C-alpha cells in the first residue's frame, strides 16, 4: 500500500484510495445477486466528502460489473435523521445533493439513511413502510465506519458463507488486500475483480 501513496510512483488515479468488498447475497435463495460494501478495510471514520468519494469509487466498480445504475444505500442504526447520529446527517445530505443535481456525475441512486434491514429485506422494508427502490434491494452499502464495514463483511463470509472478493479503488493498477484467513477461492475472486476493474 505504501507504494501507492508515494507521489513519485504516480500510481494514484483518484483523490481517495478505498476498499470495496463485493459478495453474493447470502439471503437470496434464488436469483443470486451481488452486493457491494465500502469501506471495511481502509478508511476508519469517513466524513461527508469522503463518503461521496467512496461512493464514486464503488459505483465505478459496479458499472464494470454490468450495473447500469446501481442502488447505493447509506447505512446507519436508524432510517430517520438524528442530529446525535452523524451518519444519518451525512446520508440525508448526500441524498439531498443528489436530488438537487449536485452529484450528477455519479450514475446511481443515492439514498439514506437506512437501517440495514430496510435495504436487504423486503419484508422489513414493508413493515416499516419504506417505499423506495432500495427496499430490500440495495446494490451498494456505504457503511458509517470501518468497524461496521469490517464486521458485516466477515459475517457475510463466515456466517453467510457468501462468495466474495475485495478490490482497492483509486489506483492506476489492480491492488488487492486480502485477509490472512482468506481461502484460495476468495483470493482468486479478488484477483478477477481487480483485473475487471482495471480494464478500460
What function would you assign to each model-found segment?
Residues 1-134, 140-143, 148-200:
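Anion-binding alpha/beta catalytic cores of soluble intermediary-metabolism enzymes, centered on
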